Amino acid sequence: MATSVPHPKIVKKYTKKFKRHHSDRYHRVAENWRKQKGIDSCVRRRFRGTIPQPNIGYGSNKKTKFLNPAGYKVYLVKNVKDLDVLLLHTKSYAAEIASSVSSRKRVEIVAKAKKLGVKVTNPKGKLNLEA
């Protein structure tokens, strides 16, 4: 099994979700983030004590942006043929088996990935041990 490409330390700067202003106060206001646009809005004017707003400073390092904790980019695999794409990229990409794949096909995908030297992020998911 190939190890991942060397990279800087992965830092997720803000792991909480940005909540919409007054979503905690009114049930009709969903938590999904919306930018405040009112002329008198204290959130838009960035007053002290208001909720944090998403901005470019919260962004991740470009080199580590889409990496999982093991240091791989994830590629969604739905059948055995999809693994052939990863043959030349075993150090930078890891296969993740889609949730819609049956347990019988999962076994085949994991076996082929092992043969090709491709890392699978969820090899034990949905496996039927009785079959």
From Swiss-Prot:
Localisation per UniProt entry: Cytoplasm
Pfam families attached to this UniProt entry: Ribosomal_L32e
Molecular functions per Gene Ontology: structural constituent of ribosome
PROSITE patterns attached to this UniProt entry: RIBOSOMAL_L32E
GO biological process: translation
Keyword set includes Nucleus: no
Keywords: Cytoplasm, Ribonucleoprotein, Ribosomal protein
Domain of life: Eukaryota
Coiled-coil residues: none
GO CC field: cytosolic large ribosomal subunit
Signal peptide residues on this chain, from the entry's feature table: none
Family: Belongs to the eukaryotic ribosomal protein eL32 family.
Assembly information from the UniProt record: Component of the large ribosomal subunit. Mature ribosomes consist of a small (40S) and a large (60S) subunit. The 40S subunit contains about 32 different proteins and 1 molecule of RNA (18S). The 60S subunit contains 45 different proteins and 3 molecules of RNA (25S, 5.8S and 5S).
Protein's job: Component of the ribosome, a large ribonucleoprotein complex responsible for the synthesis of proteins in the cell. The small ribosomal subunit (SSU) binds messenger RNAs (mRNAs) and translates the encoded message by selecting cognate aminoacyl-transfer RNA (tRNA) molecules. The large subunit (LSU) contains the ribosomal catalytic site termed the peptidyl transferase center (PTC), which catalyzes the formation of peptide bonds, thereby polymerizing the amino acids delivered by tRNAs into a polypeptide chain.
Protein's UniProt name: Large ribosomal subunit protein eL32
Naturally occurring in which organism (per UniProt): Candida albicans (strain SC5314 / ATCC MYA-2876)
Gene it is expressed from: RPL32
